[in-house]
From Swiss-Prot:
Matching InterPro entries: Fungal_Meroterpenoid_Isomerase
Protein name per the record: Isomerase prhC
Similarity comment: family membership: Belongs to the trt14 isomerase family.
GO biological process, one term: paraherquonin biosynthetic process
Complex formation: Homodimer.
Pathway it works in: Secondary metabolite biosynthesis; terpenoid biosynthesis
Origin species: Penicillium brasilianum
Length: 174
């Protein structure tokens, strides 16, 4: 039985990456990454910086207080770009979620750097629509202002009020 080609492994890794992100299972998200994996949210207008695995965990913990029913999927497998020699795959993705600021949808271009065996992700670059992201941030800030909140309020929520971010820093998952 022949083993899967590098191309097939990279495509499978991309699908697994999206499925795990959608699952919301943080342990599975981190298990798919190498210990040194960095996530780059590539949007200069948000002045983002790379996130290591611990920061990624914190990022998603914050997100769980303002967003739920998050989904992340590949839009069109036919537009994937696979670099077998470099062990990289690029693909268009979409995301959606319900948030305390209302529905959120965005499109992303994702590049994954895989390990030599294509089993784990060693680097992530996410490019997203900054206008849609800023719209969400504005809605979250308005919700926050209406509540008189000035910080992440995960520990001060009640009922369906899941808290909102303190400012327009790009901490909300793309």
């Amino acid at each position: 039985m022949a083993s899967n080609s590098t191309r097939e492994k990279l495509i499978a890794l991309a699908h697994k990456f999206c499925s795990i992100i959608s699952s919301g299972d943080m342990e599975a998200v981190l298990a798919l990454r190498t210990e040194s994996c960095l996530t780059y949210q590539c949007c200069p207008s948000f002045s983002t910086r790379p996130l290591n695995n611990q920061e990624t965990r914190e990022y998603f913990e914050e997100w769980k207080h303002i967003g739920w029913n998050s989904k992340f999927w590949i839009i069109d497998e036919g537009t994937m770009v696979v670099d077998e020699a470099a062990k990289k795959i690029a693909f268009r993705a979409a995301c959606s979620a319900d948030t305390i600021g209302g529905p959120y949808e965005n499109e992303n271009l994702v590049i994954l750097q895989a390990t030599d065996d294509c089993a784990l992700v060693d680097g992530i670059w996410e490019f997203f629509d900054a206008v849609r992201k800023q719209d969400l941030m504005n809605r979250l800030a308005a919700k926050q202002a209406a509540k008189g909140l000035d910080s992440w309020c995960a520990n001060t929520h009640s009922g369906d009020d899941k808290g909102v971010p303190a400012n327009n820093e790009s901490k909300v998952a793309a």
